[in-house]
Amino acid sequence: KKLSAKHILRITGDCPLIDPRLVDKILKIYKENNFDYVSNIQRRSFPDGMDIEVFSFKKLQEANKILISKSDREHVTKYFLRSDKIKKYNFFQRKDYSNIRITLDTKYDFQLIDKIFNNFNNFYFSLDDIIEFYHKNTLLFDRYKKLSEQINFQKLDKGQQIWQEAKNFIAGGNMLFSKR
């Protein structure tokens, strides 16, 4: 508001490997069309850690007037995703790489990202370069992903742990709660 911004590009701090070319593609779609919200997270196809969102400041102001939950205020784009009043577009790629984890939430994520940086001779590498590195080192990526998921799982409260376990055995995990 202070800067009279009309549009907001949201890239969170846990996504240090963002590919500027991907940002440019998403911005181009946003600029050339009449969308309120464009992202690559509605239907995941990019690695976790390549999360990009663009939305209008006007829609953010409108959301601010109606949002009351603490969760919505903290993660305002969740409202954009579920609202039918928001004209949205999801940018995705045909090849699904959503199983690749290159986000920075745990010390293991940091260790993997450090290995990615050390693999390249300079800081100018793309998502394609990371994916090529992934294909040559899938066991490395999978090991760090598993370690990070174990830490994140330990942080969940008991109810969330039960639901998470149920999802592995029951389609959707929701039947667990209908039986209680």
Regions found by a protein language model. Give the residues of each.
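Conserved donor-nucleotide/metal-binding helix-loop-beta segment in metal-dependent transferases, i.e.
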Residues: 15-45
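Conserved nucleotide-sugar donor-binding
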Residues: 5, 52-64, 107-111
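Conserved N-terminal catalytic core of the sugar/cofactor nucleotidyltransferase
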Residues: 1-3
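N-terminal glycine-rich, Lys/His-bearing helix-loop that initiates the first secondary-structure elements
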Residues: 154-180
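A recurrent flexible, glycine/aromatic-enriched loop bordering the glycosyltransferase active site
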Residues: 41-52, 95-96
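Basic phosphate/pyrophosphate-binding loop/patch that engages nucleotide-derived ligands
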Residues: 25-36, 56-72, 79-82, 160, ...
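Conserved alpha/beta core of the MobA/IspD/sugar-nucleotide pyrophosphorylase nucleotidyltransferase superfamily
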Residues: 55, 76-154
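Short aromatic/hydrophobic "clamp" motif used to bind/position activated sugar donors
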Residues: 8-9
